[in-house]
Design a protein with these regions (language model features):
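Membrane-interface amphipathic segments in extracytoplasmic regions
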Residues: 1-219
Length: 219
């Protein structure tokens, strides 16, 4: 979840075979880079979607001990800002409130106001139309990817070095990581510019486990 997961998966697809699962992306960006189409079907039914959490994958897969299990994490203060931009500029965005849509020309006060309102906005993330706060949904989904037994955790801040270690574990040499979705965030401001005391408290509270476990800070 905004920690280069799509890019890491895509980097490994050239080494996958016809029986391997590649969830891919619903967007055209990966095709323009020359990567494979999705292969996430069992028979006629797609069973693994992009960013499928471990509890969806492992019960229908082989024994977990047969696999190297790794994930990636990112400083949540930065990841939430990335999700803020993605929520409005993704091709399938369901957030239609363009009053909150960030713009590269926004000043810091405008960004702070939009960002705080975004954190406290309710949206529907399922077909049942149930509403929940965006920040709560994002934080709960994030936990699914590191609250399981893992063999390695890649830190977004050390992406290339950590991914090279994963490649070594599975017998691969150095692999270049494609930078997917990197054009979504249209502002070069440091993530701290987006925060007020209130928004800082919200993100700190919702990601307290991640912050404590990985020694992340607001800097």
């Amino acid at each position: 979840m905004k920690a280069a997961g799509s890019s890491l998966e895509l980097a490994l697809t050239p080494f996958c075979g016809p029986d391997d699962i590649m969830t891919g992306s619903p967007y055209d960006e990966e095709k323009s880079l020359g990567y494979y189409d999705r292969n996430n079907k069992l028979g006629y039914r797609a069973i693994w979607h992009q960013h499928a959490p471990p509890d969806e994958v492992l019960p229908v897969s082989f024994s977990a001990k047969d696999y190297l299990k790794f994930t990636s994490v990112r400083n949540p203060y930065d990841a939430v800002v990335s999700y803020f931009w993605w929520s409005f500029y993704a091709p399938d965005s369901t957030l239609k409130n363009h009053m909150l849509k960030p713009d590269r020309l926004d000043g810091s006060k405008e960004l702070q106001s939009k960002f705080l309102t975004f954190l406290e906005t309710y949206a529907s993330f399922n077909t049942k139309g149930q509403q929940e706060k965006i920040i709560d949904w994002f934080a709960d989904r994030y936990k699914l990817f590191y609250k399981v037994p893992l063999d390695f955790i890649i830190r977004y801040e050390d992406l290339d070095v950590d991914f090279s270690m994963v490649c070594g574990m599975i017998g691969l040499g150095p692999i270049n990581i494609p930078r997917l979705k990197s054009n979504i965030r249209k502002s070069s401001y440091n993530y701290r510019v987006y925060y007020t005391n209130r928004s800082y408290d919200i993100v700190t509270d919702r990601f307290s486990d991640l912050i404590d476990n990985f020694n992340y800070s607001f800097q």
